[in-house]
């Protein structure tokens, strides 16, 4: 099964290495958490919003508040995004000018749902600007949604790379090994979106892509979510069934219901 599950698995596997970082490509890929990752919850909130509302900005705020407060747990409570934690906990409704990589991660379902590049960009902006109204926060979300849309619609890696370089001004010519040597933990769109793309661009399979993203030693869960989403959008790449089963076995029924419904409606 491909689709947003590629992002959920990537984030879940990367979660163990968000704090305890690794540069080892052959890291342990087993997922042993009893709950979905914080990134996965935000992704599900977006999918729920796209399927079950009129897709207004206020309804998206409500969906994020609902899902993120429902799964408010432990040290992985929305990573290092302190402002977002407060925004969720206090049920705030105003943006705070962030350009953190959360906007680029939670937008992933938009890339599957959108019927055109323009629609992907339009709705990516809506999902970003409720919190991440900084230009780089919006651009990161649009870059990810439009990349997923383009991959799904058969554009080649080189075509997508050229588009991102032209429209988003990202430097995507950095060799993967050079990126890995210098990559640091920095939870911003300008840092994470190009890095995630470079991992996918240089990958040969879904697992290879996620391993490359996690072993950058950066914001492992979010970068693996984005890179995994790119890989899963490619019809020539299969998300391994054993990874899907391993990651989702403990997830709640309501979480899985949204995941399955979105797959049936938009990912086939």
Language model regions located:
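Structured, active/binding-site neighborhoods that engage oxygen-rich ligands
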Residues: 1-268
């Amino acid at each position: 099964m491909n689709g947003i599950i590629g992002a959920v698995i990537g984030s879940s596997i990367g979660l163990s290495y968000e704090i305890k970082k690794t540069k080892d490509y052959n890291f342990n890929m087993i997922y042993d958490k009893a709950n979905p990752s914080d990134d996965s919850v935000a992704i599900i909130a977006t999918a729920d919003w796209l399927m079950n509302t009129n897709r207004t900005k206020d309804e998206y705020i409500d969906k994020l508040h609902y899902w993120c407060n429902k799964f408010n747990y432990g040290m992985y409570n929305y990573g290092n995004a302190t402002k977002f934690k407060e925004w969720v906990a206090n049920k705030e409704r105003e943006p705070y000018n962030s350009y953190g990589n959360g906007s680029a991660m939670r937008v992933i379902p938009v890339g599957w749902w959108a019927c055109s590049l323009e629609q992907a960009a339009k709705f990516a902006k809506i999902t970003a600007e409720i919190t991440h109204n900084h230009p780089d926060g919006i651009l990161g979300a649009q870059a990810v949604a439009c990349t997923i849309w383009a991959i799904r619609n058969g554009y080649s890696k080189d075509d997508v790379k050229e588009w991102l370089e032209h429209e988003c001004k990202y430097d995507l010519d950095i060799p993967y090994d050079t990126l890995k040597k210098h990559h640091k933990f920095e939870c911003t769109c300008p840092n994470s979106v190009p890095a995630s793309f470079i991992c996918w661009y240089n990958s040969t399979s879904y697992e290879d892509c996620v391993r490359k993203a996690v072993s950058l030693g950066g914001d492992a869960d979010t970068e693996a979510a984005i890179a995994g989403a790119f890989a899963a959008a490619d019809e020539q790449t299969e998300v391994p069934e054993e990874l899907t089963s391993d990651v989702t076995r403990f997830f709640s029924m309501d979480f899985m219901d949204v995941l399955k419904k979105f797959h049936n409606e938009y990912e086939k």
